[in-house]
Design a protein with these regions (language model features):
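Bacterial N-terminal signal peptides that target proteins for export
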Residues: 1-9
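Bacterial signal peptide processing site
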Residues: 23-25
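N-terminal helix-cap/turn-to-beta initiation motif at the start of protein domains
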Residues: 28-46
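Short, solvent-exposed loop/hinge segments that bridge or flank secondary-structure elements
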Residues: 41-71, 105-113
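C-terminal motif of bacterial Sec signal peptides marking the signal peptidase cleavage site
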Residues: 18-21
Length: 152
């Protein structure tokens, strides 16, 4: 049930942002991107922008990708004042056009992510952009971080 409310909150944020914004999704970076591999994605990432807007100071989402197990753990407080964690598996697929797709599933039979994402890595693997592939125009910017803060 907690996951339902989290997904509902994310959907409401996305719908609100989409409804009040007349802008097209943020363009993908012009600088040369690097191959999106399990090794390149491995490690800790912090969401810094959603739909072109910076995250509110008290709101956060961190995700830690494990290249060996193809698993992730995500910590966020998007729909709660307390940290929640979500786990699951992810896959990376290179498309015929040379782009990369990131898709995933949640643990405990919750199901698949709401959409797949085109992923671009740049800035020597320190920056990452996700853009939804299902037409919903979701755009998320991440930066690599050394570690994820401890949440109590």
């Amino acid at each position: 049930m907690r996951l339902f409310y989290r997904l509902l909150a994310i959907a409401l944020i996305a719908a609100t942002t989409f409804a009040v914004s007349c802008e097209k999704p943020a363009p993908l970076p012009n600088e040369k991107s690097m191959a999106v591999t399990y090794s390149a994605l491995d490690g800790c990432w912090q969401l810094t922008m959603w739909q072109g807007a910076s995250m509110a100071e008290e709101t956060y989402l961190y995700i830690d990708f494990d290249r060996r197990e193809h698993r992730y753990t995500m910590w966020d407080n998007i729909d709660s004042m307390y940290a929640t964690d979500t786990t699951g598996t992810f896959t990376i697929t290179e498309e015929e056009d040379g782009t990369y797709t990131l898709s995933g599933t949640y643990d405990y039979g919750v199901g698949d992510w709401s959409c797949d994402y085109q992923v671009i890595l740049w800035n020597k693997g320190k920056s990452m952009k996700w853009q939804s592939r299902n037409g919903s125009h979701q755009v998320m910017d991440f930066v690599r971080v050394d570690e994820i803060p401890e949440f109590n």
